[in-house]
Amino acid sequence: MKPKTPRLLVQGSTFARAWQINRFIKAKICRSEGMKLVTLLAGLTFFCGVAFGDEKNVIQQAPKELPGQAPWWSIDLNSDYTLGSKIIKSGNFGSQAVYHYEIEALRNFHLFDKYYLQCGIDSERFDFSRSNSLYPSSISSMAAEVSFSYWTGEDFYPVLKLEPGFYYTGDHITPNSFDVPIRAVAGYQIWDKVHLVLGVDADPFEQEPVIPICGVNWKINDQYNLRAVFPQPRFSYTPNKTLEFFIAADLIGGGYRNGPTNDHRTNNALLDYSEYRAASGVNYNPQKGVSFEMTVGWSIARRFDYFRAGPDDAAKSAPYFKLDISIDL
């Protein structure tokens, strides 16, 4: 006969089992709560990693400017002052000085290979210290600029440039002062480091509506370069990457529509103003995309030519000073 188990022992065993089951359930619950906490912490860690890690990746993986990559913007500001000199045919008029500035801002759009479309504005002004019905107080232009240009890795060379805008004297902006000067230039390699440069400069407002551009560009070596191209020849010496010394010639001016005057010869007439200069100077490049060019030279001749109506006067030569600032962004 099987011996009976005492009732108290059975109840104690039952309580023990219940206690074990309760402990097991609590352990499960704690383990579940712990898993939830771990999951929450892992989620927060992942979120923070995404938030801050991606920002770091964005900063680290931002596209860097490649060597030779063209800038988005090209800005150029030049200003010069020509000391006073007398106009030869108007000795009683007195000595006339000239202050000149030009600002150009262009946005560069890549087309293909090394060719770019440049679009922007060009504003230029000449202010004269003396004026009358023959010689205006100022000559100005406000024009848009559209260029198809070649990027060498350091500079843009316009192949085709159009500058539609208003070319006027004083403050007389009128519909008949609208003009579209056009410049087309191409280079052809004829020998190693020697290029033939040919082109035309067309402007209906000038006495010669089409002016040829011709010459050669010879990169003698890494330090010397000869750009024998009319009308802006230049010989330069570059001892290092930050400095360039040069001698050069420059032709500035253009065709403009004169405003109303009391002289029938100049009243609303076309004026071809030109100034040919020779100079030497230095170009300083403290960093890529920034340059300062300082020039001291001689204004050989300044000319006021109302080629359709009569007066054609020139001023005597005089010294001038120029500062040119170029910034690429």
Model-flagged regions — what are they?
Residues 213-218, 223, 280-285, 315-329:
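Outer-membrane beta-barrel "beta-signal"
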Residues 107-109, 148-150, 188, 202, ...:
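Residue-level signature of outer-membrane beta-barrel architecture
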Residues 1-72, 329:
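Cleavable N-terminal export/targeting peptides
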Residues 101-105, 144-146, 182-184, 214, ...:
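Membrane-embedded beta-strands of outer-membrane beta-barrel proteins
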Residues 111-117, 154-158, 193-198, 223-226, ...:
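Repeated loop/turn-to-beta-strand initiation elements of outer-membrane beta-barrel proteins
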Residues 126-132, 231-314:
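Outer-membrane beta-barrel translocator/channel fold
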Residues 79-87, 121-127, 164-170, 200-206, ...:
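Transmembrane beta-strands of outer-membrane beta-barrel pores
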Residues 54-175, 179, 269-277, 310:
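Transmembrane beta-barrel domains of bacterial outer-membrane proteins
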